[in-house]
């Protein structure tokens, strides 16, 4: 397939309007795929996301003996035996952080050796804290560089019953350990420590999905969970639309003074990034300081929106954005300053956007380096709704989580010029 090298957004001459349903949640789809793969029996996952990230997860599970059928564009039918088997080759997961971290932990339940690997971007993303936490349970696991590839020599048995992990690190580590623990041989307590507890909402997503597949997990304190060794049972599971994807549509609506029907009430989302709706709705009077710690994937959306705000905006609690698909703080400041020098500045791990509503209606030719990051591409497309000359490099990277993004904007009234 030929990839599009560049895509220039042409600012629409009228408000965007129409119906645009976000795809299924990536976060929930990958959790449900793993839990269904660990379960005994056949599960039906509906409303699922079919994208690069979820295909990596599905293919890895197939390599470990799970049967997965795809009867339509939003359904997975998953049949597991209750145990994963050692794959014949290393699991290649591209730059899919959820799949990599979740499967690294799940590999401990395999009776044999599993190598979890990814592309050149994934090989720069840290996984050391998860590896260390697994070692505390007596699991034989190694990652020489602190990043993938990771080698796990599993047995399905643990030598300890308690894990302490820094709550300021990626919530994906905690979710990975929780899902793994239910497949072990003894109850396990998982406790977050440290002053900064980030992205608790994603942990809530994990425990809700675990319970739907028969696990017994109890929150024994605000930062502690006890997981019983119940294993998982097959279930039919409905996946809600992706709240992170919805943020682009909410922002497009307020930027264009349009009316976009997402097909789902804003308060129906259970994902943490849905919190962004209340913030986005305040545009062009966004708060002077926005804490992104509990809605991390929405920060790029709001940061680009902030460029057109009435007053400057400081983003705090976003240090983890430096170890996403790219250094998103650096990518955001670079892209905004490429539009106009001085539009953004980094102060430590904070990002300050020096908003200027007068940007709207100007022509400021700028090529935006996406760093192969889907969220950078989708967020900076929003700038192109108000500024002429915004060109997105490697626009096809949106296939990671929202393959139909450009087509969706087009149905709402956005047009493009592309160059292969």
UniProtKB/Swiss-Prot annotation:
GO terms for cellular component: cytoplasm. Its EC number is 2.5.1.19. Monomer. The active site is at residue 297. 3-phosphoshikimate binds at residues 26-27, 31, 170-172, 297, 320, 324. Its main location: cytoplasm. Catalyzes the transfer of the enolpyruvyl moiety of phosphoenolpyruvate (PEP) to the 5-hydroxyl of shikimate-3-phosphate (S3P) to produce enolpyruvyl shikimate-3-phosphate and inorganic phosphate. It catalyses: 3-phosphoshikimate + phosphoenolpyruvate = 5-O-(1-carboxyvinyl)-3-phosphoshikimate + phosphate. It is found in: Cytoplasm. Transmembrane segments: none annotated. HAMAP family: EPSP_synth. It comes from the Bacteria. GO terms for molecular function: 3-phosphoshikimate 1-carboxyvinyltransferase activity. Pathway: Metabolic intermediate biosynthesis; chorismate biosynthesis; chorismate from D-erythrose 4-phosphate and phosphoenolpyruvate: step 6/7. This is 3-phosphoshikimate 1-carboxyvinyltransferase. It is an enzyme of class 2 (transferase). Belongs to the EPSP synthase family. It holds the Pfam family EPSP_synthase. It comes from Rhizobium etli (strain ATCC 51251 / DSM 11541 / JCM 21823 / NBRC 15573 / CFN 42). Phosphoenolpyruvate binds at residues 26, 97, 125, 172, 328, 375, 400.
